[in-house]
A protein has these predicted regions:
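Ferredoxin-reductase
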Residues: 2-90, 148-150
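FNR/FR-type flavoprotein reductase catalytic core
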Residues: 78-230
Length: 230
């Protein structure tokens, strides 16, 4: 796997245990909103069973002017995450591989979109909505249900910025029952006149896919993010 070098410029603590790593863009490197890449850190001592590469979604867009990934670092974490938390500093180099994935909005094919995101699964959604903010589609309505059981939400300022985008509604939810109820209500009301994007852990993606299909939503209307990096 070939890696290009990006320079870390800033680390932002988004929540009590989630951090964004912001980097320069290597000349000639491009990507589409919703894609993920392999990131590589070198020069740090890692556990023998650990590796220096992880897949994370690119949470920024080309228009942002920087590369960014966001990851959760729990109390119990790998030596890779320990390097991110306590060792890596602005000015250090991070390897970036070729972008992968096709997780995207279809604002031309549908009049409505429901986005269901849980926890750190919000990262591709941030990129998709950032791109949509620059190029909104007239008459298209997007509803975002972003849930975190602890009530800790990444990108707080970004959600305020989205309030200016016509047709975009964001609900920040900290109650799991409300999260599921709001999803059910939307699916029952809108049915297959919308596309449904799900971004969370593999378990959440599977559970909500089954839930939506049980409410009559066609499989082809449901997209799930490949949640590789934690």
């Amino acid at each position: 796997m070939e890696f290009l070098e990006a320079t870390l410029t800033k680390i932002v603590q988004e929540t009590s245990d989630s951090y964004s790593f912001i980097m320069t863009i290597h000349e000639g490197f491009t990507w589409k909103a919703g894609q993920h890449v392999a990131w590589q850190i070198n020069g740090f001592e890692l556990d023998a069973e650990d590796r220096n590469t992880r897949f994370f979604t690119i949470a920024s867009t080309m228009a942002d002017g920087y590369l960014m990934f966001t990851t959760r670092i729990a109390d119990k974490h790998t030596s890779f995450k320990e390097a991110l938390l306590r060792k890596i500093k602005p000015g250090d180099k991070i390897g970036v591989a070729r972008p992968l994935g096709t997780f995207a909005l279809d604002a031309e094919g549908f009049k409505k979109t429901l986005i269901v995101a849980g926890g750190i699964g919000i990262t591709p959604i941030r990129a998709l909505l950032r791109a949509y903010k620059d190029h909104p589609v007239e008459g298209h309505a997007i509803t975002v249900l972003y849930s975190d059981d602890r009530g800790e939400f990444c990108y707080k300022d970004f959600w305020k910025d989205l309030e200016t985008v016509p047709g975009v509604e964001v609900r920040l939810i900290s109650d799991r029952e409300i999260f599921m109820k709001d999803t059910d209500t939307y699916a029952k009301d809108v049915q297959n006149d919308a596309e449904y994007l799900i971004a969370g852990s593999p378990g959440m993606n599977n559970a909500f896919t089954e839930r939506l299909e049980g409410l009559g939503i066609k499989k082809e209307n449901i997209k799930t993010d490949v949640f590789i990096g934690y």
